[in-house]
Amino acid sequence: MGWLFLKVLLAGVSFSGFLYPLVDFCISGKTRGQKPNFVIILADDMGWGDLGANWAETKDTANLDKMASEGMRFVDFHAAASTCSPSRASLLTGRLGLRNGVTRNFAVTSVGGLPLNETTLAEVLQQAGYVTGIIGKWHLGHHGSYHPNFRGFDYYFGIPYSHDMGCTDTPGYNHPPCPACPQGDGPSRNLQRDCYTDVALPLYENLNIVEQPVNLSSLAQKYAEKATQFIQRASTSGRPFLLYVALAHMHVPLPVTQLPAAPRGRSLYGAGLWEMDSLVGQIKDKVDHTVKENTFLWFTGDNGPWAQKCELAGSVGPFTGFWQTRQGGSPAKQTTWEGGHRVPALAYWPGRVPVNVTSTALLSVLDIFPTVVALAQASLPQGRRFDGVDVSEVLFGRSQPGHRVLFHPNSGAAGEFGALQTVRLERYKAFYITGGARACDGSTGPELQHKFPLIFNLEDDTAEAVPLERGGAEYQAVLPEVRKVLADVLQDIANDNISSADYTQDPSVTPCCNPYQIACRCQAA
């Protein structure tokens, strides 16, 4: 109890005009040059085809494309799940949802979050002497000890969950459109079933709500400012740092940008991509001007585009899941089709990561945890097993193919949440359950069980259009190995130290800075 009180007390101490916990940035610089810094940037609902370096039709990612030319681009990189909370939990633990307990999204009223017996990447690096910060969306529990300040992050600035989970006065663009927060004593204007609640979206700095509702139009620039301030302060101190930037882009609602250089004539989605790219460019520029030689920057996404948002959703590129679209529904976010989990990914570290390299290694967001831990000269937590692996050899251009096998869990489209219903085995992909998420036209594909899995050869069929013939030699050669690797991982999980998330809901835990005001309004700090 005393430790908890101390953490709460320290989290509110102010330095240089913005809140920081009482982190000793001024410890001796003896670690400088010995341990690398890490900046991990995670986009939200960004499609594989939204990166210009991946897909020539995209023209709005100049900074990311430049990063690709200055580093390594991964074209077979996968989120660990196809929706928000499970993907983020796997990034921070290196473990699938069946191990870490997070198999579906947390709500505004969620009592729990990422189970407290799971060790986060931030906690490991904090113990190794790192200063740790998160800027952006958390979505792994906001109540009590689930808050990021108690999960290894010294500094937090951001929103506790997706920005469509609370109203704002700057609602931006959504499909269907959503109203602004109610004003004064007026009745609720939230009549759309798909729109957020009338409780305003909060913006946190550490444990304090500093703005409710948050201004979505200026949020990206605030993130850029806080991220660059954190990098400057940490680099000046001589201590190594971990900065995790979890962007609001490209999740809906798309903001009305306030950046003065915003281009005209682009689509709403293209303008959002441009703003996101500008934000990433500001962070990279700060790294380049302060800690370039000793900082590893990793950019990727949490899952594929949210197709039901129609023109406000991104591009899956060539990964169109054509077999599923013929059945109905979307093969993107929430599904185990390639469009749901194959995401853009870039690595940048001058002098360490080779320049202008395209890697076809099979990699995953799960690999971030063990790779960063290894590069930080830290140790993996004991008493548990990990699904990610250290991929340093791939990053540094040495010979290593990455994973031979990946497992894709159900993220809401079909089957039981978290169930490993799809197996990637080298070039092959086997589906034991298929189903589409809600598409722009409102359709959802039927949930279909496949005792004999559908198997696609992704090298020949990136669109996942035509499965192998069940009686053919190629299918018969692959099937036994698919069955074996799936049985092996399920047995491994059964023998592991696994966790269970608390998905209990209670309206009293809803973040609210002023319960006496409609929509929980309070003044911005």
From Swiss-Prot:
Protein name, entry field: Arylsulfatase G
Lineage of source species: Eukaryota, Metazoa, Chordata, Craniata, Vertebrata
EC number(s) recorded for this UniProt protein: 3.1.6.1, 3.1.6.15
PROSITE patterns per record: SULFATASE_1, SULFATASE_2
InterPro entries: Alkaline_phosphatase_core_sf, Sulfatase, Sulfatase_CS, Sulfatase_N
Temperature dependence: Most efficient at 45-50 degrees Celsius.
Active site positions, chain numbering: C84 (nucleophile), H139
Cofactor(s) needed by this chain: Ca(2+)
GO terms under cellular component: endoplasmic reticulum; endoplasmic reticulum lumen; extracellular space; lysosome
Glycosylation site positions: N117, N215, N356, N497
GO molecular function terms attached to this record: arylsulfatase activity; metal ion binding; N-sulfoglucosamine-3-sulfatase activity
Note on how the cofactor is bound: Binds 1 Ca(2+) ion per subunit.
Keyword Calcium found: yes
Keyword flag Glycoprotein: yes
Modification 3-oxoalanine (Cys), positions: C84
Tissue expression remark: Widely expressed, with very low expression in brain, lung, heart and skeletal muscle.
Encoding gene per record: ARSG
Associated disorder: Usher syndrome 4: A form of Usher syndrome, a genetically heterogeneous condition characterized by the association of retinitis pigmentosa with sensorineural deafness. Age at onset and differences in auditory and vestibular function distinguish different types of Usher syndrome. USH4 is characterized by late onset of retinitis pigmentosa and usually late-onset of progressive sensorineural hearing loss without vestibular involvement. USH4 inheritance is autosomal recessive.
pH effect on activity, per entry: Optimum pH is 5.4.
